[in-house]
A protein has these predicted regions:
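A detector of low-complexity, intrinsically disordered, Ser/Thr/Gly/Pro/Ala-rich segments
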Residues: 9-10, 29-33, 56, 73
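Bacterial N-terminal signal peptides that target proteins for export
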Residues: 2-16
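Glycine-centered structural positions embedded in regular secondary structure
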Residues: 4, 28-29, 170
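Long terminal segments
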Residues: 41-73, 121-187
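Sec-dependent signal peptide cleavage junction
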Residues: 22-42
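Mature extracytoplasmic domains of secretory-pathway proteins
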Residues: 78-125
Length: 187
């Protein structure tokens, strides 16, 4: 009986030590870094999910929105007093347009959440997609179809290329849209 008690105590001590060391970030294979990565992944997934929800809802309800043309290349869609969607076609005279690129901006609660842009050259189409949340870019897909996911998001200063250009133009667009439509009660 004494041997079995010692064996149980030894096993208990080993299990207890294993539990203690498993919780230690220095020794545990599951460190705080993987926790941070998981949280970052959850944020980027949330940004993409919100953008998709906004995109599908906007496309579904497009005919219900108030359509306002701003010049020959820009069309805004309003739901009550909120801008929900803008389409900007290429025009050398329009500083909001991007050369040879049709841009679609999707807004939720007056914030840019998704930008879709495309360039047509003959039969070839180049597409760009950028997913935003809280002023940061969480995912970008360029014409090479390569998905760039930024777990903790990229601020405007750290964005590059088309993701940065779309963010800048999309935010400038919403500011101008609210200023232009203030007199008719859309602000």
């Amino acid at each position: 009986m004494e041997k079995s008690v010692k064996k149980v105590m030894k096993t208990t001590a080993i299990l207890l030590l294993a539990l203690i060391f498993a919780g230690s970030p220095a020794i545990s294979p599951i460190t705080s870094k993987t926790t941070i990565e998981a949280e970052a992944s959850a944020k980027s997934d949330k940004a993409v999910k919100n953008a998709r929800k906004c995109y599908y809802s906007t496309r579904k309800n497009l005919r219900r929105y108030k359509k306002v043309r701003n010049g020959s290349t820009s069309t805004d869609y309003w739901s009550k007093n909120k801008l929900v969607f803008s389409e900007i076609k290429p025009d050398k005279r329009d500083f909001l347009s991007i050369k040879n690129t049709v841009c679609e901006y999707y807004y939720s609660k007056s914030k840019l959440v998704f930008a879709f842009a495309y360039q047509k050259k003959g039969r070839k189409v180049k597409e760009y997609r950028a997913y935003y949340m809280s002023g940061k870019c969480y995912r970008y897909i360029g014409p090479d179809k390569k998905v760039h996911t930024y777990g903790s998001g990229k601020s405007y200063e750290r964005m590059s290329g088309m993701a940065k250009k779309l963010y800048q133009k999309g935010n400038h667009n919403i500011q101008l849209a609210y200023e232009a439509n203030e007199p008719i009660g859309n602000k």
